[in-house]
Design a protein with these regions (language model features):
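Alpha/beta enzyme core
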Residues: 1-103, 117, 121-133, 143-147, ...
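Residue-level marker of alpha-helix boundaries and capping positions
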Residues: 13, 110-111, 167
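Poly-acidic low-complexity segments
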Residues: 58, 92, 105, 156-157, ...
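Glycine-rich beta-to-alpha transition loops that act as phosphate-gripper elements at the mouths
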Residues: 106-117
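Extended, intrinsically disordered, low-complexity segments
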Residues: 146-186
């Protein structure tokens, strides 16, 4: 199937070396590789990246990275962030368009939870092939549990809140499948 390597916290050259090793090992056993280039703001895996330290993916570096790593999918930084947004994300669509046209390969949008629907649709129209929305799904789950506990604070039977929380995630997934134009596709 596939694996994801995130060396975006490294220098370009270090990220290339790390990603090359992962690609070589994965491709040897028929597994594709997604890699991240550029740094997203926010928090992921307990690593915090301040907005001032977030760096958009440089199109020239993207070309070098792909040429030297032979990665199968590239996650680029164009203004999204891991975790919940404090403001409204503004995506750099010109950067996305430039990178997609130059690389002509699957492009991934990490940190897309909370990005407005119009921006998601535009990103898809410009060639984004995969969109990560983990935070949005986690929030759908925990928001439902919070709602249930607010109504029934003494509830202790997890069967009474896990099922509804899962259904809330399911509804969010269905909504996103439709938004992404993925319904009916395998």
């Amino acid at each position: 199937s596939s694996v994801m390597i995130d060396g975006s916290h490294l220098s370009l050259d270090e990220n290339i070396v790390l990603t090359q090793k992962v690609v070589e090992a994965a491709h040897d056993v028929g597994v594709s590789v997604e890699a991240e280039l550029g740094r997203l703001g926010g928090i992921e895996d307990n690593i915090s990246v301040d907005e001032k330290d977030a760096m958009y993916t440089d199109p020239t570096e993207a070309r070098k990275f792909v040429d030297e790593t032979n990665v199968d999918y590239l996650a680029i930084a164009i203004g999204t962030a891991h975790g919940k947004y404090k403001g409204i994300p503004k995506l750099d669509f010109d950067r996305l368009d430039t990178i997609k046209k130059d690389l002509n390969m699957p492009i991934v949008l990490h940190g897309a939870s909370g990005v407005d629907n119009d921006s998601i649709k535009k990103a898809i129209s410009l060639g984004v092939n995969k969109i990560n929305i983990d935070t949005e799904l986690r929030c759908a789950y925990t928001d439902k549990i919070r709602e249930i506990f607010a109504e029934k604070p003494d509830l202790f039977d997890l069967r009474k809140y896990i099922g509804p929380a899962r259904e809330n995630v399911k509804a969010k997934v269905i909504e996103k499948i439709r938004l992404f134009g993925s319904n009916g596709k395998a």
